[in-house]
Amino acid sequence: THRGTLFPYTTLFRSPIFDDTKRWLDIYFEGDVPNFTPLLCPEGTHFRQQVWNYLLQIPYGKTTTYGALAKKMAEHLQKQKMSAQAIGGAVGHNPIPIIIPCHRVIGTNGTMTGYASGIWRKEFLLELESKK
């Protein structure tokens, strides 16, 4: 254990979940494809969680559009159609970016849109993945 100086009575501990997440991020930022997904328990509405599950299915180094995700979700929910804006709202509320790869979703015309951490980071992540 370690006692911090700001909170001297707080004990920090190691967690397998944090260790797995760190290992996943280390592999990812070395430019390799992690062959596992750390335990994820994001909180959100049922709809958002469904969208985030679709994000996890986008292959490393590939992209999809908000419109394509909307079409998949409409089929999944047995609806005639769904708006790309609804999908964008769920993607924008992704609480675990990078691991849940919202950076792999682009505009219909190929534009880099809607990344809360900045478009330059989205471009960086896609460039990193394109090298593999």
Language model regions located:
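…primarily DNA-binding HTH/wHTH and HhH modules…
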Residues: 108-132
